[in-house]
Design a protein with these regions (language model features):
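Bacterial N-terminal signal peptides
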Residues: 14-22
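Bacterial N-terminal signal peptides that target proteins for export
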Residues: 5-14
């Protein structure tokens, strides 16, 4: 118990330092576009450090049973540009197939109540951990069908990215939200005075989005984030334990960030009535943006690391 307490204490100190750094920074998720960003970052990292793994993935990707949908998004692209774009579209693919036979809605999140009501709501909602474990096993199995491994690849790219978003790991229960706020989907806020009301969850999902074609967000963020946050600057990329244990740790990080930053500020006045949605403060906007940037680039690196573990690549 003392060892676990020590680990938790170190983790909270680490997260507090992150928030302190964000609070002193200037202001400069996830949507489909942000998932494309994590996919691009993962590709870049593998290209730099594990190019043989990318080659090993090519025949697996070629066997994807929904390849026609993916290829339709890559028209006119060739060579490296096409290979990188394929990673981007694979990362968002689970969102694109919602409502189809490939859909697993509960794999996108794994929520724990972080309010004082956690004592009466101790269980988890969502099965991201189960989805991660299942797809990791399939991708790691050389004897599995290539089509199944390709589907598992897309889900791993997506799930690992999803759970970096704090509100994919936490929700709030209270007298206002007796059955929870459904990870911020029932509470409305506004980014600026006079702005349109937006769900708190959507606020976080879309925080880095850029207007334009589907890859506009990836083009705006993928390379700048890697320059700002190279692996050496991210101590959270130090791993220990099984893939399952590492995934659990990533969920714990997001849970703590939801408590320390996500469910603060205007959320404390958020309302089910969109018309009465309060305005988030400039400080909240700045901190949430900085957190999103770091979590997105971390998610991209972790996707690459997950694939290395699954395919036993150095």
């Amino acid at each position: 118990m003392s060892g676990n307490y020590g680990c938790m204490k170190k983790r909270h100190i680490f997260l507090a330092l992150i928030l302190a750094a964000f609070a002193s920074s200037e202001a400069n998720a996830w949507s489909r576009e942000t998932h494309m960003t994590t996919g691009a970052i993962a590709f870049d990292d593998l290209e730099r450090n594990s190019p043989a793994l990318l080659a090993a993935l090519e025949p697996i990707i070629a066997a994807h049973p929904d390849r026609a949908r993916l290829d339709a998004s890559l028209k006119g692209l060739t060579g490296r540009t096409r290979a990188r774009a394929m990673f981007e579209w694979l990362a968002r693919w689970p969102d694109d197939v919602r409502g189809t036979a490939y859909d697993h809605p509960k794999w996108h999140y794994e929520l724990r109540v972080i309010s004082s009501w956690s004592a009466i709501w101790p269980f988890r909602n969502g099965t991201a951990s189960q989805g991660f474990d299942k797809n990791f096993r399939i991708l790691a199995d050389n004897k599995a069908k290539s089509a199944d491994r390709a589907v598992a690849l897309g889900w791993l790219l997506h799930i690992v990215g999803d759970i970096q978003q704090p509100l994919h790991a936490a929700h709030w229960a209270s007298w206002t939200y007796p059955m929870s706020d459904r990870a911020g989907t029932l509470g409305f806020v506004r980014r600026v005075r006079g702005g349109a009301p937006i769900e708190l969850h959507e606020f976080w999902d879309q925080i880095l989005d850029r207007a334009g074609p589907p890859d506009a967000t990836a083009r705006a963020w993928a390379q700048p984030l890697q320059r700002t946050w190279p692996r050496i600057r991210l101590p959270e990329l130090g791993y220990a334990g099984t893939p399952h244990a590492q995934f659990a740790y990533w969920l714990d990080e997001s849970l703590a960030l939801a408590w320390m930053a996500g469910y603060r500020d205007a959320f404390l006045r958020a309302t089910r009535d969109a018309v009465a949605a309060p305005i988030t403060s400039p400080r909240y906007n700045m901190i949430s943006n900085r957190i999103a940037q770091r979590r997105v680039v971390t998610g991209g690196y972790r996707i690459a690391d997950t694939l290395r573990m699954a395919l036993k690549a150095p």
